[in-house]
Amino acid sequence: MKIRNYLLAFVLGSTLAFTKDINFDVVGEVFDYGPQTTKIILKFDEQINPKTLDTQTFKVLTQDLKDRNITTIDFIDHNNVILNLEHGQNIKDANLLYWDDQKFSNVVIPTNYTLIQTKDMTLENRKTIKKDTYKYYMKSLKIKDVDKFTAGEMYGLKYRDFKPQKDGNKHPLIIWLHGAGEGGDSNITQILGNRGGVAFVEEDAQKIFDTPYVLAPQTPTFWMKSFFVGKRELVGEKDYTPDLVNLIKTYIRENPEIDKNRIYIGGCSMGGYQTFKTLVYAPDLFAAAFITCPAYMPSTEELNTVKDTPIWLVHASDDTTVPVSNSRESFKYLKSIGADVVYTEYKDVVIDGNKYDPHGSYFYTLHNSPINDNGINIFQWIASKKRY
């Protein structure tokens, strides 16, 4: 009789009291200032009444049990709910990386969010979901555009790469070389630390570059054998240039849809150093290069070697990490020997009203902001170059 009464109450009643597991996805995005979590996506079996949800219906906790503010709620439909999370340059609890000064590198923060329902909800059929009816479990972390890349390793170098869908045509290859803070063995920080990888898989860049392949290698240590930060010397393992060139050549060979006449290479800071070194080592491989705030002043011999490769340099005059003279002098000499070279100099780095460290002039590059005297933006200029 008790069982019968219970079933009758369940059928006729207005409250769902059983416990059910609901999975949710945490979504992130790479911004100029780094990667952050931006939203949570919930998928319910039942249709939720949108009017019963507000920003206080759920409590979101990070893996460190820090509160994340829910700013707004969106509905994909009545079953799929988006909790938009507060994020921004100064919202540290949203970060997906932290800076390890001892390693002098960015380190991935393991993401394990907790979601707690703090108020009752109502379904479209007017039944009530009590706040302890559902138990919520994080299913996955999805990062916009980063998830378009796959992982690989060759010649002791890990890498992430993006391959466009095959269409029977040849397409360019863009190689992005990260800075000093994105080395290591994670095989992810080189496309998480800044927009250096993801910028080229975004829709606009894909159109400009004719749906390119994108390759982002990661050095196990630093591209440089050694360098100083103040009085502190940081030491890399070796010169990775031969391994890097072997990786690039093998990657091209293994992907015959890549157009060998449209191989573009670029990087920022120490990645700018490595771009110069790679151009010198394999001057006949690349159709163009884009180098931002390079942590290196090439010798005249090296500049003579790369003079036949079109190069666009970008730097900020207020950069206190890498002297602007590296770009100024490189441009001046390359121009004097008749090279196809462009130089864009900014005073500081201000994007959408937000002021950043002036070493971040690569923000401009990755937003396709630099323009030459003919009114051509950097991406369009690079995309116009062919080796033969």
Region locations from a protein language model:
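Hydrophobic h-region of N-terminal signal peptides that target proteins for export
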Residues: 9-19
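The conserved beta1-alpha1 loop
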Residues: 177-179, 315-316
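C-terminal catalytic histidine-bearing segment of alpha/beta-hydrolase fold enzymes
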Residues: 312-314, 318-321, 325-328, 332-388
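Gly/Ser-rich "nucleophile elbow"/oxyanion-hole loop immediately N-terminal to the catalytic nucleophile
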Residues: 165-169, 227-269
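Primarily recognizes the serine-hydrolase "nucleophile elbow" in alpha/beta-hydrolase
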Residues: 252-305
